């Protein structure tokens, strides 16, 4: 058995793999609106949740192409909160992480249409249902329970201790 870890933009790296050549894909794509890696066209800084979901569906169509017929996909995808604030959030290039309600990329964050400020956006559910509609099997959700989660400064909801 061999393991190969591919590093780079998934949209480019997957194209180099032959059809049906992957036994198992394990991934944690950038979460929507939470981090700026300082790369043009990066995943996670789409203008809307719907645009992010569309990108994820496109990416996972390519994952499906390279997976063997008996292959499996393991996807870890966290959520984010709707926020609207009048100031610029600086880039996180270099590794600093935004808090869960902050926009990324030095852009003013806005509340996505149909949501209210502080709403949990439901990105993992939106992506899961979109992938299911695109032909993927949704077999199980597995909770990653974190006994020592990252502290948060929020006072109007519980600290997130799972993904």
Where are the model-predicted features located?
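Core catalytic lobe of class I
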Residues: 1-163
């Amino acid at each position: 058995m061999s393991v190969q870890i591919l590093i780079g933009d998934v949209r480019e790296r997957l194209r180099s793999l032959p059809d049906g050549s992957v036994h198992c894909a394990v991934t944690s794509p950038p979460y929507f609106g939470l981090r700026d890696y300082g790369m043009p066209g990066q995943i996670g800084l789409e203008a809307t949740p719907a645009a992010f979901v569309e990108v994820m569906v496109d990416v996972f169509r390519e994952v499906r192409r390279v997976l063997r017929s008996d292959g499996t996909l393991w996807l870890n995808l966290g959520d984010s909160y709707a926020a609207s604030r009048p100031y610029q959030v600086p880039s996180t290039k270099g590794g600093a992480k935004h808090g869960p309600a902050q926009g990324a990329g030095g852009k003013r964050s806005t509340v996505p249409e149909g949501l209210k400020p502080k709403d949990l956006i439901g990105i993992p559910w939106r992506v899961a249902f979109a992938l299911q509609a695109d032909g993927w099997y949704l077999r199980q959700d597995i909770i990653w329970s974190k006994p020592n989660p990252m502290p948060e400064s929020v006072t109007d909801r519980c600290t997130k201790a799972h993904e």
